[in-house]
C-alpha cells in the first residue's frame, strides 16, 4: 500500500492485520533509514509540557486522535524486524517478537525489557491492540509490576517497564480507549533508550488518580458525589480527573486555599487571609485583662497571631519582612525607629528593638502605650503628642509598668508603619530612597527625630507630623500579583479577595489539581463562613438575594464588577476623611449652592408667579420669564464663575421686574456639577429619588445622582419639580419640540409677533459689543439670534467660527423686545439651518434661503441659491415680465400721477409717517414694512401684526443682526387675533384654509379704500407703508418675490446688482441708519399672486388662488400642500413632505 510523505519525519504505522502483506520487509527498513537521518532533539530539549505530570487529558487525546486521523497505526512484523537486531545486544529470542519494528526486546538482570532501535519523536503511536486493562491501585507505585492484565494482545506490551504516573522517568503512555490499547511516546526517545510507560484508563476516567487526590489532600477522603456541590463546583469537579496532581502545595488552614509557592502563601497570610481581620472588641478586652501578652501579639495590624515567646514572634515577623534572619542591610543603609531615634543595622536587631517598645518597660507613654527604657526617650516621644512646645505634665507620664491600656490599635499602627517601611527599604528590589508616600512621611519623621532636642523643639515640626496621612494598609510586595491597587487602601473591611481573573504569572498550560480543589474549597468556605464574619457579606455568600450591596450608599448591585467599579469611583465613602480628593481636585466635598448673592431669588423660583411681574391682559405670560441675575450665576464650573462679569450689567437694571428674562423661553438647565435643581432636590435633607426609587445615605450622593444618573434628568424642567404645582397653562412646551417648515422660514422676530406687547418694553439693555447702546428702547430688529444665549459660555455650537463675537464678553444686546422674544423661542430646538453671519456677511447678505426649494415651475429651472432664483424671477421669467406689463397698464387708470409722487421723496416719506402714526407708533418705520403693510392694520384679525411691524420698524441698525432676516409672511396666514396669545402654536382651523385668510368683506373694502388713498408708485425708502393695489397678505409661495420686489412697480429701477441697490437704498433713509442688505429697492407695481384691480373681496380671494409664481394653478392639485402652502413639481417630493415635514404633524409633538 502506498504511503504519503509527511513534512516531519514521523513513524508511519499500520494495523496489525496488514502485517501479513509482503511489504513488511521493506517498509520498516526504509522508515528506519529516513528517521535515522533526521536530527531529533534529545529528551532535555523538548518542552516541559510533555512531562507525565504536566500531560493533561487533552494532550493525551491529541496524540491519540492524531494517530487515528493519520490512519497510521501499525504494529510491526516480527519476521522483518528480526533481521535488523543489533549484533551487540544480548542473545534474545526474536522468533516470538510481535512488537513494532522501531522497538526491540533485550534482557537485563534476567528481565525482558523493551528499548528503541532508533530515534523516536514525541507522539509516536502504536496501536490499536486488542486487550483489557485492569488497574490495581496498590501497583501504581514506582517499579511496580504490570498494572494490567491483557486478555488478548501483543506480548511485547507486557514486557514494558511500568512506572507511576508522577515519575519523571516516564517516556510513554499506555491507555485504553474504546476497549482497545494504545501506546504513545510522551518524550523524545533516543536510540537504545528503554521504554518506561504509565497507565491511563480513559474509560474509567482515572478513578485511581481521583481517589489519590482526595486521600492525599488536606481534607478527609470523601467522594465528590457525597458532597452537595454548587454549580461552579460541579463544573470544576468535571475537569478534576484530568488535572495534574502537584504535591508541592502550601495550604492556608484558615481559608482552605492551596498555593504552589510559599511566597504566595506568605502574601496571602499578610494581606488576604480571612484570619487576619482583627476583632477590635475581643482583642482590647484580652489586652486589658492580660497586659503581659503584648509581646506575644504580632504588631502588624493585619495579623492576629499570638505566640508564646519572643523567639516564635521573631520567627513569625520574618514572614512579614520577607528577609531571612541572618541577612543584614547593604553597606551604608540603616533602619530608624519612628517611635524613637534608634538606628539598627540589621532587620533582626530592628525587630528586637521594636519588641522593647511593646514589652514591660520602665517608662510607658500614656497616649500610645509604647514602652521606653529611659525617661529621655519617653520625653522625646511625647513631643509627638503635645500640640504646642510645652513639655507634657507629670500626669502624662507613667513610671509604672502596670498602666491601663485602652487600645493597642494606635501602637500597632505606628509600629506597623515603621516596621513595614523599614522592611521595604531592606528589600533588595526596593530602593532606599524611594519616593513613595510611606517613605516621604517616614523621611519627614526621621528628620524631625534626629534633629530634635529633649528640651527645645519648634512647634512647626510637630505640626508637620501627621498620623492620618500615613496609610495603615501596606502596599503589596508584588504589584503584579496583587489585585489591590498600590497606595490605595480599602474604605471598608474586606475578607480575602476572591479574584476571578488569572494573573499572567499564574497561568499554566494545563490545569493543576491543587488549583481546582482550592477554588472548590473557596466556594465551600464562603458558604460556611457566611453569617459568622464581622465584615459585610459583599462577595462571600451565594445566599444573599442577588449581587453585592454598598452599605455606605445603600445600593445593591447584581454584578460584582459593577460593585467594584462603584466602590472605586463613585462610592460616597471616598469622600470621607478628606475635604478634597487629590484625584479630583475640582470636586468639593459639599455641593455648592447655585444661588446668586445679588438677588434673593434662586433657580427654584424661576417658575414662581409671585417673583415676577403680573400682567392682567396677558395671564399666560406672567411666569414666562426668570430673573436674569439668577441665571447669570449658573455659568462657570462652580456656578459662580461669570458672576463678576455680569455684576455691572445687573446693577443697571432699574427694578426687579425689569430683570425678568428667560433663555430661549425655558428655565435654564445647565449641565454643571453645581447646576440648579428644583425645589425638592435642593433640600439638604433629601436623600430619596422618587423617580428611581433609590435611597442614598448622603445628600451629596443624591445630588450627583440627580444631576448625572437620574432617569428624569432629560425631562423638561417643569416635569422634574414635584413640589412646584404649576398650572398646566403656565408650563412651557417640550424642550425638543420639532420646528415646522413655516416656523423655520420665519425670522426669529416674526415667528410669534403677537406676544410682543408694549408693556414689556421697559427692561434696561445689557451692553453688547455687537450693537449700539445709544437708544434706551430697541425694537425687534435689533434682537440677536435667540439661539445665541445671553451667556458667552453656552453659545450654541452651531454658530459659525466666523461669528464676529468675542465669547469672553456678554454676547447679546438684550433689549426690551428680546426679553420677550427669547421667551417665545424657548421651546424651539436648535435650528441648524440658521447660521449667524459675520459682520462682513451681514452687509451683503441675501434673503434667507427658502428651505431648499429654488425651482421656477414656469421655466422648469432649478437654482442652488436663492439669489439666483430671485434674480431670475425679477428679470428673466416670462410670466413675471408679462405680469409687469399688465400691471403697468393699470397704473395709469388707478393712480393718475404715480410718477410725480414717486419722484418726490419728501411726499413719500410724509405719507409713510402718516400711516405709521395711525397705528400708534411715532417712530420712523423700517424696511420690514414691505411685509406688514399699513393696510393690514385695518383687517380685524391682523391688528397685532401691525403692531409687530411697528416694533420691527423702531430700529434700523439691522447690520448688527445675528440673523439675516427674510420677510416671510407665512405667519400671517395662520394668525387669528387672540389665538396668538397661546404659546403652543398648535393646529387651528384657520390653518386649513387654502393658502389665505378668511377675510370679511367689510375689512377688505376698508383695506381697499385705505390703500387707494396712497399712490401706488410711492417709494419705499422707509419701508413702513407699501402703497400698492394689493389688499391681502402675500402668499408664502411667492415670499422671495415679495422680499425682493417689495410689491411695487419699478419704472425707474436701475439695472444694477443687489449691492448697488442696497447702496442706493441706504442713502434714502432719513434717520441716517442703514437698512439690511436684503431689502431690495424694486418698486414693482403689485404682487404676482394678486390681481391689482379687484374691487371686491370675492375677486381678491379668487386672485389668490392664481397659481404659484404667476402660473394659474388650483391649490387643490395633487402636488400642492395647502397647509404649508408649498407647490411641488414632483409627486415623490410631495409625498415625502406630507409624510415627514408637513406642519400637520405639529400636534403630534406637543405633550
Swiss-Prot record:
Pfam families per record: CCHC_ZFPM2, FOG1-like_PR
GO MF assignments: DNA binding; RNA polymerase II-specific DNA-binding transcription factor binding; transcription coactivator activity; transcription corepressor activity; zinc ion binding
Superkingdom of origin: Eukaryota
Knockout or disruption consequences: Mice die of congestive heart failure at 13 dpc with a syndrome of tricuspid atresia that includes an absent tricuspid valve, a large atrial and ventricular spetal defects, an elongated left ventricular outflow tract, rightward displacement of the aortic valve and pulmonic stenosis. These mice also display hypoplasia of the compact zone of the left ventricle.
CDD domains noted in UniProt: PR-SET_ZFPM2
PROSITE patterns from the UniProt entry: ZF_CCHC_FOG (PS51810), ZINC_FINGER_C2H2_1 (PS00028), ZINC_FINGER_C2H2_2 (PS50157)
Biased composition regions of type Basic residues, renumbered to the chain: 1-13
Binding site for Zn(2+) 2: 550, 553, 566, 571
Residue positions binding Zn(2+) 5: 1121, 1124, 1137, 1142
Residues involved in Zn(2+) 4 binding: 856, 859, 872, 877
UniProt subcellular location: Nucleus
GO biological process: atrioventricular valve morphogenesis; cardiac muscle tissue development; cardiac muscle tissue morphogenesis; embryonic organ development; fat cell differentiation; heart development; in utero embryonic development; lung development
Family: Belongs to the FOG (Friend of GATA) family.
Subunit structure: Interacts with the N-terminal zinc-finger of GATA4, GATA5 and probably GATA6. Interacts with retinoid nuclear receptor RXRA when ligand bound. Interacts with corepressor CTBP2; this interaction is however not essential for corepressor activity. Interacts with NR2F2 and NR2F6. Interacts with ATOH8; mediates indirect interaction with GATA4.
Protein name in UniProt: Zinc finger protein ZFPM2
Species per Swiss-Prot/TrEMBL record: Mus musculus (Mouse)
Gene: Zfpm2
Amino acid at each position: 500500500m502506498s504511503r504519503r510523505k509527511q513534512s516531519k519525519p514521523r513513524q508511519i504505522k499500520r494495523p496489525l492485520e496488514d502485517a501479513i502483506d509482503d511489504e513488511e520487509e521493506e517498509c520498516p527498513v526504509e522508515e528506519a533509514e529516513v528517521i535515522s537521518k533526521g536530527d531529533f532533539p534529545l529528551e532535555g530539549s523538548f518542552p516541559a509540557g510533555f512531562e507525565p505530570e504536566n500531560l493533561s487529558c487533552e494532550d493525551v487525546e491529541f496524540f491519540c486522535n492524531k494517530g487515528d486521523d493519520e490512519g497510521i497505526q501499525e504494529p510491526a512484523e516480527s519476521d522483518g524486524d528480526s533481521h535488523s537486531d543489533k549484533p551487540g545486544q544480548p542473545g534474545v529470542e526474536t522468533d516470538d517478537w510481535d512488537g513494532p519494528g522501531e522497538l526491540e526486546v533485550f534482557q537485563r538482570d534476567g528481565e525482558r525489557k523493551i528499548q528503541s532501535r532508533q530515534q523516536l519523536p514525541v507522539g509516536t503511536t502504536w496501536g490499536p491492540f486488542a486487550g483489557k486493562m485492569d488497574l490495581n491501585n496498590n501497583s501504581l507505585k514506582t517499579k511496580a509490576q504490570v498494572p494490567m492484565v491483557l486478555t488478548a494482545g501483543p506480548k511485547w506490551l507486557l514486557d514494558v517497564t511500568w512506572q507511576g504516573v508522577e515519575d519523571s522517568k516516564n517516556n510513554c503512555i499506555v491507555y485504553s480507549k474504546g476497549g482497545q490499547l494504545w501506546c504513545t511516546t510522551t518524550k523524545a526517545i533516543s536510540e537504545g533508550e528503554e521504554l518506561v510507560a504509565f497507565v491511563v484508563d480513559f474509560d474509567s476516567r482515572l478513578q485511581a488518580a481521583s481517589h489519590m487526590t482526595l486521600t492525599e489532600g488536606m481534607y478527609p477522603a470523601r467522594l465528590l458525589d457525597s458532597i452537595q456541590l454548587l454549580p461552579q463546583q460541579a463544573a470544576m469537579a468535571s475537569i478534576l480527573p484530568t488535572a495534574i496532581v502537584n504535591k508541592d502545595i502550601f495550604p492556608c488552614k484558615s481559608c482552605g486555599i492551596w498555593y504552589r509557592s510559599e511566597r504566595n502563601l506568605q502574601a496571602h497570610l499578610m494581606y488576604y487571609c480571612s484570619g487576619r481581620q482583627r476583632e477590635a472588641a475581643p482583642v482590647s478586652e484580652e489586652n486589658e485583662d492580660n497586659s503581659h501578652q503584648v509581646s506575644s501579639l504580632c504588631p502588624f495590624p493585619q495579623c492576629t497571631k499570638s505566640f508564646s515567646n519572643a523567639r516564635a514572634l521573631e520567627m513569625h515577623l520574618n514572614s512579614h519582612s520577607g528577609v531571612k534572619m541572618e541577612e543584614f542591610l547593604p553597606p551604608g543603609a540603616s533602619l530608624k525607629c519612628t517611635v524613637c531615634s534608634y538606628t539598627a543595622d540589621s532587620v533582626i536587631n530592628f525587630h528586637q528593638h521594636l519588641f522593647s517598645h511593646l514589652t514591660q518597660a520602665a517608662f510607658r507613654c500614656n497616649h500610645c502605650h509604647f514602652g521606653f527604657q529611659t525617661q529621655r526617650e519617653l520625653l522625646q516621644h511625647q513631643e509627638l503628642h503635645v500640640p504646642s512646645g510645652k513639655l507634657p505634665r507629670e500626669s502624662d507620664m507613667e513610671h509604672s509598668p502596670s498602666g491601663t491600656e485602652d487600645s493597642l490599635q494606635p501602637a500597632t499602627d505606628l509600629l506597623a508603619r515603621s516596621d513595614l517601611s523599614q522592611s521595604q527599604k531592606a528589600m533588595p528590589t526596593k530602593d532606599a530612597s524611594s519616593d513613595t508616600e510611606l517613605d516621604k512621611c517616614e523621611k519627614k519623621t526621621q528628620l524631625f527625630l534626629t534633629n530634635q532636642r529633649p528640651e527645645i523643639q519648634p512647634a512647626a515640626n510637630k505640626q508637620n507630623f501627621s498620623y492620618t496621612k500615613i496609610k495603615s494598609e501596606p502596599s503589596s510586595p508584588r504589584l503584579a500579583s496583587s489585585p489591590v491597587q498600590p497606595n490605595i487602601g480599602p474604605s471598608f473591611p474586606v475578607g480575602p479577595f476572591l479574584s476571578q481573573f488569572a494573573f499572567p504569572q499564574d497561568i499554566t498550560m494545563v490545569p493543576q489539581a491543587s488549583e481546582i480543589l482550592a477554588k472548590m474549597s473557596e466556594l465551600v468556605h464562603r458558604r460556611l463562613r457566611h453569617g459568622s464574619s464581622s465584615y459585610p457579606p459583599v462577595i462571600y455568600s451565594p445566599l444573599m438575594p442577588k449581587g453585592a450591596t454598598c452599605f455606605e450608599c445603600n445600593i445593591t448591585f447584581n454584578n460584582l464588577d459593577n460593585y467594584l467599579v462603584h466602590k472605586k469611583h463613585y462610592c460616597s465613602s471616598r469622600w470621607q476623611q478628606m475635604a478634597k480628593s487629590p484625584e479630583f481636585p475640582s470636586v468639593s466635598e459639599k455641593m455648592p449652592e447655585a444661588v446668586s448673592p445679588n438677588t434673593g431669588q434662586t433657580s427654584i423660583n424661576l417658575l414662581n408667579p409671585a417673583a415676577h411681574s403680573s400682567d392682567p391682559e396677558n395671564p399666560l405670560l406672567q411666569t414666562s420669564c426668570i430673573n436674569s441675575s439668577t441665571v447669570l450665576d449658573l455659568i462657570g464650573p462652580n456656578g459662580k464663575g461669570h458672576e463678576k462679569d455680569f455684576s455691572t450689567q445687573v446693577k443697571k437694571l432699574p427694578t426687579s421686574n425689569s430683570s425678568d428674562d428667560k433663555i430661549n423661553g425655558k428655565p435654564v438647565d445647565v449641565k454643571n456639577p453645581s447646576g440648579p435643581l428644583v425645589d425638592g432636590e435642593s433640600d439638604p435633607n433629601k436623600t430619596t429619588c422618587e423617580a428611581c426609587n433609590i435611597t442614598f445615605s448622603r445628600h451629596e450622593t443624591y445630588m450627583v445622582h440627580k444631576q448625572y444618573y437620574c432617569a428624569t434628568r432629560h425631562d423638561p424642567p417643569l416635569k422634574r419639580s414635584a413640589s412646584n404645582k404649576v398650572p398646566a397653562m403656565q408650563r412651557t412646551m417640550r424642550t425638543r419640540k420639532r420646528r415646522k417648515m413655516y416656523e423655520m422660514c420665519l425670522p426669529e422676530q416674526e415667528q410669534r409677533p403677537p406676544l410682543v406687547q408694549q408693556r414689556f418694553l421697559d427692561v434696561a439693555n445689557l451692553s453688547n459689543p455687537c450693537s449700539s447702546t445709544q437708544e434706551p428702547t430697541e425694537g425687534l430688529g435689533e434682537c440677536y439670534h435667540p439661539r445665541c444665549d445671553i451667556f458667552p459660555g453656552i453659545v450654541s455650537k452651531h454658530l459659525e467660527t466666523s461669528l464676529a463675537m468675542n465669547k469672553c464678553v456678554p454676547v447679546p444686546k438684550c433689549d426690551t423686545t428680546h426679553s420677550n422674544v427669547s421667551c417665545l423661542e424657548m421651546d424651539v430646538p436648535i435650528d441648524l439651518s440658521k447660521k449667524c453671519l459675520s459682520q462682513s456677511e451681514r452687509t451683503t447678505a441675501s434673503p434667507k434661503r427658502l428651505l431648499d426649494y429654488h425651482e421656477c415651475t414656469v421655466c422648469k429651472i432649478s437654482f442652488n441659491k436663492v439669489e439666483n432664483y430671485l434674480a431670475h424671477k425679477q428679470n428673466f421669467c416670462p410670466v413675471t415680465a408679462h405680469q409687469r406689463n399688465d400691471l403697468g397698464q393699470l397704473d395709469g387708470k388707478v393712480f393718475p400721477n404715480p410718477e410725480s409722487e414717486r419722484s418726490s421723496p419728501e411726499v413719500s416719506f410724509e405719507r409713510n409717517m402718516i400711516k405709521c402714526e395711525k397705528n400708534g407708533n411715532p417712530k420712523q418705520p423700517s424696511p420690514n414694512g414691505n411685509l406688514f403693510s399699513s393696510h393690514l392694520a385695518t383687517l380685524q384679525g391682523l391688528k397685532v401684526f401691525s403692531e409687530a411691524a411697528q416694533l420691527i420698524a423702531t430700529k434700523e441698525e439691522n447690520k448688527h443682526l445675528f440673523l439675516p432676516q427674510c420677510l416671510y409672511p407665512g405667519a400671517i396666514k395662520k394668525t387669528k387675533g387672540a389665538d396668538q396669545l397661546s404659546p403652543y402654536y398648535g393646529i387651528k382651523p384657520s390653518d386649513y384654509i387654502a393658502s389665505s385668510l378668511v377675510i370679511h368683506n367689510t375689512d377688505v373694502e376698508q383695506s381697499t379704500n385705505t390703500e387707494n388713498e396712497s399712490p401706488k408708485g410711492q417709494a419705499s425708502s422707509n419701508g413702513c407703508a407699501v402703497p400698492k393695489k394689493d389688499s391681502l397678505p402675500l402668499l408664502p409661495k411667492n415670499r422671495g418675490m415679495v422680499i425682493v420686489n417689495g410689491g411695487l412697480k419699478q419704472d425707474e429701477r436701475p439695472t444694477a446688482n443687489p449691492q448697488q441697490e442696497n447702496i442706493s437704498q441706504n442713502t434714502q433713509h432719513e434717520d441716517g441708519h442703514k437698512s439690511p442688505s436684503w431689502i431690495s429697492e424694486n418698486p414693482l407695481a403689485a404682487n404676482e399672486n394678486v390681481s391689482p384691480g379687484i374691487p371686491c373681496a370675492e375677486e381678491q380671494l379668487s386672485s389668490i388662488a392664481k397659481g404659484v409664481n404667476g402660473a394659474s394653478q388650483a391649490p387643490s392639485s395633487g402636488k400642492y400642500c395647502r397647509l404649508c402652502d408649498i407647490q411641488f413639481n414632483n409627486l415623490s417630493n410631495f409625498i415625502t413632505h406630507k409624510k415627514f415635514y408637513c406642519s400637520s404633524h405639529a400636534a403630534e409633538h406637543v405633550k
